[in-house]
C-alpha cells in the first residue's frame, strides 16, 4: 500500500495551472467495493487537510485501462495532478521527464 500511495502522490504536483488551494485530479482504478473504500480513506484525509480531490476513476483491466488513459493525457499535454501507478512504471515516466519532484514529508505515512 505504501509504494502504491507514493506512486499515486508522485504526480501530485505535475499540474502547471495555478489554483487558490490544494486541489488535485486523481486518475485511478480503485473502483470496486473494497478498493473504493480504501481510496475513500485517502480522499477523506486530503479533504480534512483542506484539499479538494477531483476523482477520475478508470474501470477495467486491473489498471491497464487507467495506464492507457494516463498516457493519452500526458501526450495531450493534460496530465492529471496525481495517478495510481503500478510498480516500476513510475521509473519509466520519470525517465521521460513527466514526473514532478515530490516531498515525502508532505505525505502522512
What is each model feature region?
Residues 16-20:
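Sec/Tat signal peptide C-region and signal peptidase I cleavage site
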Residues 22-31, 53-58, 81-82:
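Short, well-ordered beta-strand elements
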Residues 107-109:
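Conserved small/polar residues in nucleotide/adenosyl-binding loops
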Residues 36, 40, 61-101:
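Pocket-flanking alpha-helical
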Residues 4-14:
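Sec-dependent N-terminal signal peptides
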Residues 33-54:
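Short, polar/charged alpha-helical segment
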Amino acid at each position: 500500500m505504501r509504494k502504491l500511495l507514493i506512486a499515486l502522490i508522485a504526480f501530485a504536483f505535475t499540474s502547471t495551472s495555478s489554483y487558490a488551494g490544494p486541489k488535485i485530479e486523481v486518475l485511478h482504478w480503485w473502483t470496486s467495493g473494497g478498493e473504493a473504500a480504501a481510496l475513500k480513506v485517502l480522499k477523506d484525509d486530503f479533504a480534512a487537510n483542506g484539499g479538494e480531490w477531483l476523482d477520475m476513476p478508470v474501470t477495467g483491466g486491473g489498471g491497464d485501462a487507467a495506464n492507457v488513459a494516463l498516457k493519452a493525457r500526458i501526450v495531450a499535454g493534460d496530465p492529471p495532478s496525481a495517478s495510481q501507478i503500478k510498480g516500476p512504471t513510475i521509473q519509466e515516466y520519470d525517465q521521460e521527464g513527466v514526473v514532478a519532484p515530490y516531498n515525502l514529508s508532505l505525505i502522512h505515512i
